[in-house]
Design a protein with these regions (language model features):
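Active-site neighborhood of glycoside hydrolase catalytic domains
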Residues: 171, 175-179, 185-194, 198-272, ...
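Catalytic domains of carbohydrate-active enzymes, especially glycoside hydrolases
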Residues: 57-84, 186-189, 288, 294
Length: 507
């Protein structure tokens, strides 16, 4: 009997501990401001062979599932090799869309425009992702006659089965900037995103043939490596300025390789790693761009596991947190590697909890981008379910970028409830504001029960983030006799949030 009493007591204490841990987890991960992105790539061929309807259905399904998992921003690849998944006067249609470079989709559609519309309907941002310098991947056998490397072969060089637009030629850089300005000016994108491809990744036995360009365009720089870095620096600054001159609210983001420099290369600030380096191998001086404000956000690709011998995840997230905090810092996360790597303390679970904990401990980390979206929607290793039920259980707004604009729009107007045969709908009118900096583009709807403090900093009270000027109350939320308060705020282009306006209803 005594043993049973002790057993029950232990069981009770265990349940209390588990309950406390669960409450602690939800409290810990309830950030109202958090960039929760996912990359949707085409270069892997996942859409090749699909009809227009099949691809749209596939993307719509992915977006629905990603929203359920808490994702609030999509980074969609639209230019993998100087081609286009959108209508372009500069570049041919992508073979990763239609199977043949230069061939338009049939039935005709514009994937970028469609994705912008679909993301905005779901309250998500859409960032157009381009590969700036890569002109041909290894698997592409034929380029269209309208491709830049065919029309102007002098602007590109061959390297390890690829074609690369030469960063050392001003006309090549200008061409990419013109392509970006065309995208930003014609499409309602929330961001323009480039990845880690600048100068090509080093390959054994390969040489970048740019002696002639170095001789012609060195601008007094005597060291070729410094000159190459300067070429990329000039490009990044030029691109940043072009984007913000075209549309000041469009965010410019970069997702570089995860190591800036190893300690052996830079004793002062190098990380305790031994992998390939942005600065030395790709000629990408990420910290210069961040510190000079030439990017709006940086997403280092930390695709390794905690405990990796050459590139330890924990070492690197702490390094980036320390040195790259002058602009928004998000972490590029490899979903599959995370769930396949056992936790170092408890090998019966994967590394997702440990990595999430590290994210929350870093004061400069303001978000995550998941590589890649399909791994989340396929729920590999239960990753998507854990986001939905634990880490991203409640919705989040993307972080503010006060260095672009920090002024919030005015309150919404004329809130009212109307009853229809199929339910009750809350309507409101947008606040007055015509300029991009004060015009409302989205709204946040919160719900509070009678007697509850109105606290819009609590994301668990968010019931919708929408571009509509109405919210239909679900039948499950209507309980006769109960009184609820609905609160609506307005968001501008940069997710600055207005003061709340509330309206009560008794069912």
């Amino acid at each position: 009997m005594k043993k049973n009493v002790i057993s029950y007591r232990r069981l009770f204490l265990t349940l209390i501990v588990l309950l406390s841990a669960t409450v602690s987890v939800f409290a810990q991960y309830s950030n109202k401001r958090d960039f929760r992105g996912a990359w949707i790539q085409c270069v892997n061929g996942q859409f090749m062979g699909m009809s227009t309807k099949q691809m749209q259905d596939t993307l719509a399904s992915q977006l629905d599932r990603l929203k359920e998992c808490g994702v609030n921003a999509i980074i969609f690849q639209v230019r993998p090799e100087c081609d286009a998944l959108y209508v372009s006067k500069y570049e041919p249609w992508s073979r990763f869309l239609t199977g043949v470079q230069g061939k338009a989709p049939y039935p005709f559609w514009d994937p970028l425009n469609w994705m912008i519309d679909q993301c905005h309907k779901r309250g998500m941002e859409l960032h157009a992702w381009i590969n700036p310098f890569r002109a041909k991947t290894k698997t592409t056998n034929q380029l269209a006659s309208t491709h830049i490397a065919i029309k102007h072969p002098e602007l590109a060089f061959a390297y390890d089965g690829q074609m690369i637009l030469n960063p050392g030629i001003p006309e090549a850089r200008d061409y990419i900037v013109d392509v970006v300005k065309d995208i930003v000016s014609r499409y309602d994108v929330d961001g323009l995103h480039i990845d880690d491809y600048f100068y090509p990744y080093p390959a054994p036995g390969q040489t970048i043939r740019d002696d002639a360009e170095f001789a012609k365009y060195n601008n007094g720089i005597k060291n070729k490596n410094d000159w190459r870095r300067d070429n990329v620096n000039v490009f990044i600054k030029q691109l940043y300025e072009a984007i913000h001159e075209t549309k000041p609210w469009v965010k410019f983001g970069i997702s570089p390789f995860g190591i800036y420099r190893n300690k052996k290369s830079d004793q002062l600030i190098g990380s305790k790693t031994s992998g390939l380096q942005n600065y030395d191998d790709l000629y990408a001086d990420i910290l210069m761009w961040v510190n000079n404000g030439w990017v709006d956000y940086c997403v280092p690709q930390l695709y390794w596991e905690i405990g990796h011998k050459a590139a330890d995840y924990e070492t690197l997230i702490k390094w980036w947190n320390k040195y790259a905090g002058k602009r928004h810092l998000y972490i590029g996360e490899d979903v599959i590697r995370t769930v396949k790597s056992p936790d170092l303390v408890n090998r019966s679970i994967n590394q997702m909890p440990a990595k999430q904990k590290l994210h929350r401990e870093m004061n400069n980390v303001q978000g995550t981008v998941l590589w890649y979206a399909k791994a989340v929607t396929d729920n590999v290793g239960n990753y998507g379910s854990m986001l939905k039920n634990v880490y991203w259980k409640y919705p989040a707004l993307v972080p503010q970028m006060k260095y672009i604009d920090g002024k919030a729009p005015k309150k919404v107007r004329k809130m009212k409830f109307l009853a229809f045969e199929d339910g009750i709908v809350l309507f409101w009118k947008s606040p007055k504001g015509k300029d991009w900096s004060n015009k409302a583009v989205k709204y946040v709807v919160y719900k509070f029960v009678k007697g509850e403090k109105i606290n819009i900093d609590d994301p668990s009270k968010i019931v919708a983030i929408t571009s509509d000027e109405f919210y239909k109350i679900p039948a499950s939320a209507i309980k006769p006799g109960e009184k609820h308060y609905y609160v609506v705020t307005a968001l501008d282009r940069l997710s600055n949030e207005s003061k709340p306006r509330k309206k009560s209803i008794r069912y």
